[in-house]
Every structure is written in C-alpha cells, then in structure tokens.
Amino acid sequence: MSEAHIYPVKENIKAHTHADNDTYLAMYQQSVTDPEGFWSEHGKIVDWIKPFTKVKQTSFDTGHVDIRWFEDGTLNVSANCIDRHLAERGDDVAIIWEGDNPADDKTLTYNELYTEVCRFSNALKEQGVRKGDVVCLYMPMVPEAAVAMLACTRIGAVHTIVFGGFSPEALAGRIIDSDAKVVITADEGVRGGRAVPLKKNVDEALTNPEVKTISKVVVFKRTGGNIDWHEHRDVWWHEATAKVSDVCPPEEMKAEDPLFILYTSGSTGKPKGVLHTTGGYLVYATMTFKYVFDYQPGETFWCTADVGWITGHTYLVYGPLANGAKTILFEGVPNYPNTSRMSEVVDKHQVNILYTAPTAIRALMAKGNEAIEGTDRSSLRIMGSVGEPINPEAWEWYYKTIGNEKSPIVDTWWQTETGGILITPLPGATALKPGSATRPFFGVQPALVDNMGNVIEDQAAEGNLVILDSWPGQMRTVYGDHERFEQTYFSTFKGMYFTGDGARRDEDGYYWITGRVDDVLNVSGHRMGTAEIESALVAHPKIAEAAIVGIPHDIKGQAIYAYVTLNAGEYPTAELHKEVKDWVRKEIGPIATPDVLHWTDALPKTRSGKIMRRILRKIATGDTSNLGDTSTLADPSVVDKLIAEKAELV
C-alpha cells in the first residue's frame, strides 16, 4: 500500500488536552511498569461507597484464568452516572433523544433522569426483580432503554440487552442462556421509517418451550400499534411507573458483582454471553471516554451505535454519563429520510464529538457531497471510528468531507470482550496515520506473536495480536461456561489473551489491524489480510465497498474471490474488470490480484453493519447447502441474489 500521510497533532487541540504526547508517554510507562500504582490512583475516577484496598488480582495461566480488579471496593453504577452530578449539574442535559423522524426529539436533564431511573427501579422491584436477577432488554432506541439499563444497575440486577433487530429465535436463545426473569420491550420500534414488531417478537420468543424463567414482560408504548396482550404476564411501562415512589436508594454493589451479560454472535453454535462486572468496567469506561475523546465539560457527544452493542453500552450510556456529558441517543439511521441526516443531526444539536462506524462512513461516501448538503458541521471538534478497521480512503473522506479537515479522528480498536477501547490515538498526543489504530491505551500491553506463540520483538512486524496482561474493563468469563472462556481466549497462546485479530506494527510502533485471523489468506505461501486487499479495492474511485474471501485453488492453495459494490451510477464492464485487477496489482502487488470479481449491489450484513464473511465464503466455494444462522442479517434476501449471481459467473 502507498505510504500513509501523517497528520500531526493540531495545536488548538494540544492547548487544552487532557494528555499531550509527553503526558501520554509518562502515563503509559507508569501504567505498564506499575499497574497497581497507576490503577490505584485512576480507580478514583469513579465514586466508591467503600474504597478499595486491593487493586489487581489477575492470572492468565492455563487452568487458572482469574480476573479481579478493585475486589474489596463497593460502588453503584447508576449513582456514578446520575447522583454524583446532581448538586453541580442537575439541570444540565444528560440525554438528547433524536427520533427516527427528524421532527421528534426530546431531552432529559440529570435531575429528570434521576427521577425516571428511580421510578423504574421501584417498578422493577414491584415486578419481583431482586439483586442478582437477570433482566432482558429488547428495546428500540428511546431514552427508556438507557433508563432501564440504569435502573437495573441501581437495584443490582444484571441486564442483558438483545439488539432490537434480532429474530425471535435469537432472542429466545439469549433468554434461555441467561435465565432472565423479566423482559423489557416496546410495542414497536421505529427505524428508517419502518415499524419493528418488538412485542410480537417477544411473544413469539416466549412460546419456545425451553423459556421457563420469564415471569413478566414490561412494555413501553412507543407507537401505539396493535399488539397481543397477556393479562397476567404483560405490564405497561407507564402504568408500572405511575404508582411508585420517585426515590430509590442505590444498592451497594461489590466491584466484582456482575453488571451485564452481552451476547456476541458466534457464527455457529450456542450464543456466547460475555460477562462484565461492576467496578473495573466502570473505571475503564469512564477513563477511556475522558481521554480517548478528550472530553471537555459541557460538550455534546454522539455515538451512533445502538444500545444493543457494546459500543452503545460503553460509549452511549456508561462512559458519557459517568463523566457528566450530554449524550445523544439516535433512533434512526444515518441516511434516512435523506443522505445528509447524520450531518443535519450534528448541526441541529451542535455535536462536538462524533463516534460512528466505517460501514456508515462508506455508505455516505458512495453518495459524495449529498452527505453534507445544506450543513456546515462546524461544531465538530473530535471524530471517532469504531467496529472494524477503517480503510485509508474512507478515513480521508471522513476527515475532509464530514470534519472539514479540522477534527482529529480517533480510530479505535476494541471488542465486546474488552469492555472499552484498547488501541487508539489520543487527540492531543498522537500524530495520525489514516487506517492505523496507532498506540495502546493506558494499562494495555499489546504484542504480536507468530503461530507458535513466540513474541515478535522486532519493531516493524506482523503477527497475531495478543494482550499480555489484564486491564480493568476486561470480561471476566463466558456466562455459565468458564471453560469456554479459557478455551476461546487463552488456549491458543498460553498465558496471553488472544484477540482473534491479526495486526502489523510499523517502525513508529503504530498498530494496523489487518482483520480477523480467519480472514487471512494464504496465496502461494504469502499471508495477506483480507482488509488490506479490501482497502486497495475501495481506494478505486468507482468502488463503494468490497469484501474478500479465499477459495481453494489447486496450485496456489487459495485464490482470491472479491465481492465488489460500485458507486451509484457506475456499472460493471469488461474494461472496468481489467482496470480493477490492474489497480490492485499496482496498489499491493501481483500476488494480491483477485482471481474472481463478483459484482453485486449489496453485501450480507448484520444489523450492526458487519459484513457476514462466513456466508460470503460459503457462496464463493459453492457450499450453499448449510449457510448457518442468517437471522442476524439486516436483509436476508441479499443471500439468494448473491447465490444467483455466482451461478452466472463463468
């Protein structure tokens, strides 16, 4: 790939930052040489009921994986996100809700949020929810979703959120695995102008004979649409909260008490419930939010993620509110009712920090200047990217077009399992290279290992990305299956947390995530990350999106199969076919030239925007008899279209 352009730290950011480069280097050094001392000091970023005296008790040893932080301290998450701000900023806005329809919006101040959360906490208690019980949320993006999360944390219940786009089968599987006692949902959700039948899906999920633990379903009225009602089970949110007190003292929780379970979609098999606990998670969420986004008091923060994903948990709800920020909760999608919706929301609410995903950026980029029509986005100070590696071309477009070349981009790498951001630039400290997640956050010790598990000491290197020691936000276990936790994350490379990603490190020590290790191709003995070839393809001016998979090849071992979506107004031709192959040859080298170009209008994506490569691999190899679970796809019809197109390829 061509050498990346370097963007130095902006002077205006450096002048008011929490950490310039010297501060970052000093803090990072302390965090890895003296983690006890570092986290003993920075653990105080949250309020403790009983202060901790133990800081870090962690082991990655085979058969003894055990992760505990701040173990003897006690605290309450909702008190940290709400109560501690009331004296100073009770009348400040906590949550701005922007509806799917641009005419719908409302705000909640910290005082109002306190009242709502206390009321709903008491309502949950009335429905029989006790400390330690699991509550399942299957909610639209309305303020009540955040209220329900915070109410669970207030009374010591464990929430498990299932994204509102998941099917009844997927919902039932998560309810069964988590032993949830109550479901909180809405009559319907609204997204992109369409109603989502949430209550209907819950009703269907609860007909599964293996669902045995649910006693109540609390229903928030979002649309007033027609729904079935089960008299002894279903309860309206507004009725449940009308007759209870608006005072609810926060439950004193131990640092290692479970806070939430969040299921990651394993491509096959039983859902994997990632368990996060109270103290370490909140410290890490609060700390990363403050430093990564260089948050300054009074700023407005917009994370476009759904609360059903880890990004929504950590950087829409807990991180911003623990810091006393204004956080935007957006019900819609970035391109509805028009392509410039995201930019319009930025202007309307004077957003200072925008955190979104490469898939949204690329979708807008394909529409060119339509994405910013009639807006100036002058309020933006910091922009972020999350969810997958961002290719340099999309990075540059985001920086120049959305950000007017004045907002640094924090390209953040992390996972559901990590609780918070692990590798990232800091706005006032890090010179930026488009496409690189740059350097580790405080306390995070990344390393590259070869396939035998040997740490690669060279500065410039490529290998499997591992983390050598624990950090406070790390998941503690797979719910109900600690053996699976050890097996999945600690057995491949002994004594290390294996991320499942490959990465390269450049001569400046910057990390470049190359994609999942199972997305590594081996062509004639050459290892190549699919992300690198995809980046080269997307850099072509006519290409909107690309996905690469490997298919078996008699001579090369693997051949390169490229799915390519063109920009609006472009059409596949024989000339373009040759041009694209020549382009990749020029960008990376002959070894990376795609063997097959499969033109298509759309790629199969989950509702969080991730491309389902597992399905693409099967279609490319002609193995379409068992495509596995397609219930998490945003548009399942894409699959049949791809299979038909594949049949027509010579």
From Swiss-Prot:
Report the record's Gene Ontology biological process terms: acetyl-CoA biosynthetic process from acetate
Summarize what the UniProt record says about post-translational modification. Acetylated. Deacetylation by the SIR2-homolog deacetylase activates the enzyme.
- Which positions bind ATP? 387-389, 411-416, 501, 516, 527
EC number of this enzyme = 6.2.1.1
Which residues in this protein are found as N6-acetyllysine? 610
**Binding annotation for Mg(2+):** 538, 540, 543
- Cross-referenced Pfam families, in alphabetical order? ACAS_N, AMP-binding, AMP-binding_C
UniProt enzyme class: ligase
Instruction: Give the matching PROSITE patterns.
Output: AMP_BINDING
- Please list the GO terms describing molecular function: acetate-CoA ligase activity; AMP binding; ATP binding; metal ion binding
What UniProt keywords are attached to this protein's entry?
Acetylation, ATP-binding, Ligase, Magnesium, Metal-binding, Nucleotide-binding
Q: Name one GO cellular component term.
A: cytosol
Q: Which cofactor does it need?
A: Mg(2+)
Briefly state the protein's biological role.
Catalyzes the conversion of acetate into acetyl-CoA (AcCoA), an essential intermediate at the junction of anabolic and catabolic pathways. AcsA undergoes a two-step reaction. In the first half reaction, AcsA combines acetate with ATP to form acetyl-adenylate (AcAMP) intermediate. In the second half reaction, it can then transfer the acetyl group from AcAMP to the sulfhydryl group of CoA, forming the product AcCoA.
* PANTHER family, alphabetized: ACETYL-COENZYME A SYNTHETASE
Q: Which NCBIfam families match?
A: Ac_CoA_lig_AcsA (TIGR02188), PRK00174.1 (NF001208)
Q: What is this protein called?
A: Acetyl-coenzyme A synthetase
Query: Source species, please?
Result: Vibrio vulnificus (strain YJ016)
Lineage of the species this protein comes from = Bacteria, Pseudomonadati, Pseudomonadota, Gammaproteobacteria, Vibrionales
